[in-house]
Amino acid sequence: MDNWLKQEIWSKTQHQDITSDDCLLLSTDWVEFLQMSQFLKQKLLQLLNCIKEKRKKAVIYPPDNKIMFWSYCCAPRDIKVVILGQDPYHGGQGTGLAFSVSYEHSIPPSLKNIFFELQRSDPLFHAPNHGCLNSWATQGVLLLNTVLTVEKGKAYSHSDLGWQWFTNYIISSVSEKLSNCVFMLWGTKAIEKSILIDSSKHLVLKAQHPSPLAAASQRVGTWPKFIGCDHFNQANKYLEEHKKKPISWALL
């Protein structure tokens, strides 16, 4: 299939030869782990070049040096938990990690609910006065948005640019190459990714999105409300059962 795409599609479109993987913005660990073919690398580079062109006409978040920040915070071999987000915060407060914000920004509503659920389920957890989740990532929590860029003030504005194939590839690669990871899928868009995950070798947890809108909804959904889902306790129990060090959620 890859050869056919290369011959029939890619050869007929303008593309740039890749002489160094640095242009992909990914950490070396992730380049080696994903083992993307030359065709897929060119496809990713084309997407990144598209983002550069869009920056000439609009404000795009996050900056180039933060698009793949998740890959520098959490090496593939260290992954224990995967938490999927939708797209970066469109107000510019994102850091390149799903749900996380830099220290100088206020804590967004969805992250406040994440902290609330942690306080409810873990008596040792005390909500911090910031929303930086870097310490989770360095413990092995992959905080991955399924769309990696966004235009200022326009939520999900880059959903049709082509990020989905790349993040789907990441999710399926983690599922295939690793074992006994916990996938936390919150909200419809994240839950749709469950088809990419082998539930026979990983724990897949599903709940409604932690946003206040979902929390306030009176509609009876297929999945449990986020508040009360107990995902953080379930994750650590599973990790301990499989001889892995649990995540210190309180370490922020």
Swiss-Prot record:
<keyword id="KW-1048">Host nucleus</keyword>
<dbReference type="InterPro" id="IPR002043">
    <property type="entry name" value="UDG_fam1"/>
</dbReference>
<dbReference type="Pfam" id="PF03167">
    <property type="entry name" value="UDG"/>
</dbReference>
<dbReference type="GO" id="GO:0097510">
    <property type="term" value="P:base-excision repair, AP site formation via deaminated base removal"/>
</dbReference>
<dbReference type="InterPro" id="IPR036895">
    <property type="entry name" value="Uracil-DNA_glycosylase-like_sf"/>
</dbReference>
<comment type="function">
    <text>Excises uracil residues from the DNA which can arise as a result of misincorporation of dUMP residues by DNA polymerase or deamination of cytosines. Therefore may reduce deleterious uracil incorporation into the viral genome, particularly in terminally differentiated cells which lack DNA repair enzymes.</text>
</comment>
<keyword id="KW-0234">DNA repair</keyword>
<feature type="active site" description="Proton acceptor">
    <location>
        <position position="87"/>
    </location>
</feature>
<protein>
    <recommendedName>
        <fullName>Uracil-DNA glycosylase</fullName>
        <ecNumber>3.2.2.27</ecNumber>
    </recommendedName>
</protein>
<dbReference type="InterPro" id="IPR018085">
    <property type="entry name" value="Ura-DNA_Glyclase_AS"/>
</dbReference>
<keyword id="KW-0378">Hydrolase</keyword>
<dbReference type="GO" id="GO:0042025">
    <property type="term" value="C:host cell nucleus"/>
</dbReference>
<keyword id="KW-0227">DNA damage</keyword>
<dbReference type="InterPro" id="IPR005122">
    <property type="entry name" value="Uracil-DNA_glycosylase-like"/>
</dbReference>
<dbReference type="GO" id="GO:0004844">
    <property type="term" value="F:uracil DNA N-glycosylase activity"/>
</dbReference>
<comment type="similarity">
    <text>Belongs to the uracil-DNA glycosylase (UDG) superfamily. UNG family.</text>
</comment>
